[in-house]
């Protein structure tokens, strides 16, 4: 009877659209995580944590953002930190990828339904080879996170001893690879995030490597693995690599130029340390959320540059957020094609479909609108500058996690807005809209005449 009940309970999910199922399961994971973080055992004080704070933390972890209301290292006990780390790993890889691990362990066959959800979650256009892709993702993730944890373990070992060094290595490796930005080092008086290690090349370059690898995307991994020569890679992979390289080194150059003599950021460092800190800032803005200096000390122009880099984010099908590198690339290519009076958008001797151009434009406009509205709300509700409110809003919507220091003082309404933004940012506005608002695609029976409108 009990088995029959659960079978009936799961029947609606078997006929549900993959996009809608992904949204609902992510919501369930967040609520479950919030419930666990509310438990007295989750906090160092042994007292229950308020539900809104727990919900904010669980959403930030599952959506791999990194914004926090309470310090992760000092507020949460080991149980709470383990819950946060599990939420980061599930959110970074996707619940279906994690579920496949159990399918493999139990030697169960992955059916068509599961393949459909996996394809939607990973941004794949094909169901064939999806199981093989998941296997490669799990193996690659374990190898990269393991290597990062090992390097950080040996770096932390002389400073913290075996137990803490092992935990710090594992936690920060997973957090960096998943582009989450959570850290548990604050109980060692580091001054917040990775500020203590601003001049440490081992920590800086290890974290940067993990962030970049996690932000490239699983599809790019596979393409690079099978085609070591750049010319043989797909147009998408080449576009991702080119845009990522330009943004990282271009952003680093801009930050170095703007902040070179700023005493609150790079001013007190040696020239080589300034370049490393500028490079780290450019990388971490790609939705990672670690910081090696106070973000509130950035100049106004630097904050504007940071806003743009946060908006762009990482690549599709990765652990990163933002509107994605290729989305911005397609919009810029479309603008260039229009300026040259071309009727189609072309790149590397290939033509980009008009629907892809329309989707990219729509997504970018939606993110800009939501960022502006959210910033206005935070500025009015919490009496903070519009500049800092915009920084916080973009950081939440693009799942970055960097803050100018206003997160812990936000009112309940602003916290809820950021929770919604983090949720939208991780799952994607398109995924949520298609999953819940779009009707089933039907053949258009009526074709209307075109009309001319003036633009520009």
Predicted segments — roles?
Residues 1-456:
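Membrane-proximal intracellular helices of multi-pass ion channels
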């Amino acid at each position: 009877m009990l088995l029959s009940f659960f079978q009936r309970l799961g029947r609606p999910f078997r006929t549900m659209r993959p996009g809608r199922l992904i949204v609902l399961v992510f919501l369930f994971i967040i609520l479950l995580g919030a419930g666990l973080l509310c438990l007295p055992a989750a906090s160092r004080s042994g007292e229950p944590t308020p539900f809104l704070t727990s919900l904010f933390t669980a959403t930030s972890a599952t959506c791999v953002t990194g914004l926090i209301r309470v310090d992760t290292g000092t507020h949460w006990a080991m149980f709470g930190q383990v819950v946060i780390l599990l939420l980061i790993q599930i959110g970074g890889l996707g619940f279906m990828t994690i579920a496949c691990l159990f399918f493999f362990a139990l030697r169960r066959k992955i059916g068509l339904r599961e393949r459909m959800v996996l394809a939607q979650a990973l941004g794949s256009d094909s169901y064939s080879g999806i199981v093989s892709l998941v296997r490669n993702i799990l193996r690659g993730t374990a190898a990269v996170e393991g290597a990062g944890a090992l390097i950080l373990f040996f770096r932390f070992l002389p400073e913290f001893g075996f137990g803490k060094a092992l935990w710090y290595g594992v936690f920060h490796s997973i957090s960096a690879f998943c582009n989450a930005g959570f850290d548990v080092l604050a109980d060692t008086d580091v001054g917040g995030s990775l500020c203590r290690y601003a001049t440490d090349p081992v920590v800086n370059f290890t974290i940067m490597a993990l962030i970049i690898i996690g932000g490239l995307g699983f599809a790019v991994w596979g393409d690079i693995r099978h085609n070591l020569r750049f010319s043989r890679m797909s147009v998408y992979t080449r576009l991702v690599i080119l845009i990522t390289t330009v943004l990282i080194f271009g952003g680093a150059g801009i930050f170095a130029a703007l902040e070179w003599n700023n005493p609150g950021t790079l001013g007190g460092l040696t020239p080589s340390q300034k370049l490393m800190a500028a490079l780290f800032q450019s990388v971490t803005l790609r939705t990672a959320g670690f910081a090696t200096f106070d973000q509130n000390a950035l100049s106004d122009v630097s904050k504007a540059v940071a806003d743009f880099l946060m908006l762009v984010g990482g690549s599709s099908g990765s652990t990163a957020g933002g509107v994605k590198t290729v989305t911005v690339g397609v919009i810029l290519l479309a603008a260039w094609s229009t300026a040259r009076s071309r009727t189609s958008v072309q790149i590397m001797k290939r033509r980009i479909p008009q629907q892809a151009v329309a989707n990219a434009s729509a997504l970018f406009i939606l993110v800009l609108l939501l960022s502006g509205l959210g910033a206005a709300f935070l500025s009015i509700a919490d009496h903070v500058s519009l500049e800092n409110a915009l920084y916080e809003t973009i950081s939440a919507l693009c799942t970055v996690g960097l803050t100018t220091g206003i997160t812990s003082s936000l009112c309940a309404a602003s916290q809820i807005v950021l929770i919604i933004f983090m949720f939208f940012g991780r799952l994607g506005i398109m995924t949520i809209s298609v999953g819940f608002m779009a009707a089933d695609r039907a053949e258009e029976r009526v074709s209307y005449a075109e009309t001319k409108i003036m633009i520009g």
